[in-house]
């Protein structure tokens, strides 16, 4: 699963997911892409599940790029613990995804295969997504 090797701060504040994505909104590496239409925290497990679903369908054909990385630690206090006594320990990692962000890219397969692979990947994610074809490859 994806997580940073080392971080400057072990615990971070939750923050707000306002507005649309400022960067990572264009298809850069591949021909096809999966774009987020809603804001969400995508966990490293969800990213991995989507990656596995795409790889299983595409088999050995094509190449996949993961354009998001879970670099935000989410803390959690143990069950049945009284409130107070500090912030909990980091439990899992999330990627902050805003609307318009390209999450996955692929190339080297037909559009039908890519569409189905991204549809399977989208089922593993907790947000609405859209399949995109790079503008110069449409038609």
Swiss-Prot record:
Name of protein: Large ribosomal subunit protein uL16
Family, as annotated: Belongs to the universal ribosomal protein uL16 family.
InterPro entries (UniProt xref): Ribosomal_uL16, Ribosomal_uL16_bact-type, Ribosomal_uL16_CS, Ribosomal_uL16_dom, Ribosomal_uL16_sf
GO molecular function: rRNA binding; structural constituent of ribosome; tRNA binding
PANTHER family on file: 50S/60S RIBOSOMAL PROTEIN L16, LARGE RIBOSOMAL SUBUNIT PROTEIN UL16M
Quaternary structure annotation from Swiss-Prot or TrEMBL: Part of the 50S ribosomal subunit.
Role played: Binds 23S rRNA and is also seen to make contacts with the A and possibly P site tRNAs.
Upper classification of the organism: Bacteria, Pseudomonadati, Chlorobiota, Chlorobiia, Chlorobiales
A family per Pfam: Ribosomal_L16
UniProt KW keywords: Ribonucleoprotein, Ribosomal protein, RNA-binding, rRNA-binding, tRNA-binding
CDD domains, A to Z: Ribosomal_L16_L10e
Gene Ontology biological process: translation
GO terms under cellular component: cytosolic large ribosomal subunit
Top-level division of the source organism's lineage: Bacteria
Cystine bridges: none
């Amino acid at each position: 699963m994806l997580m940073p090797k080392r971080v400057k701060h072990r615990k971070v504040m939750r923050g707000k997911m306002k507005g649309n994505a400022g960067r990572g909104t264009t298809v850069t590496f591949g021909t096809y892409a999966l774009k987020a239409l809603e804001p969400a925290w995508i966990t490293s497990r969800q990213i991995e599940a989507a990656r596995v679903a795409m790889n299983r369908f595409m088999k050995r054909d094509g190449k996949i790029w993961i354009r998001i990385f879970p670099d935000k630690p989410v803390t959690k206090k143990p069950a049945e613990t009284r409130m107070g006594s500090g912030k909990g320990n980091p439990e899992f990692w999330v990627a902050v995804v805003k609307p318009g962000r390209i999450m996955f890219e692929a190339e080297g397969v037909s559009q039908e295969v890519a569409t189905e692979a991204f549809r399977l990947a989208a089922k593993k994610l907790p947000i609405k997504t859209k399949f995109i074809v790079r503008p110069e490859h449409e038609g």
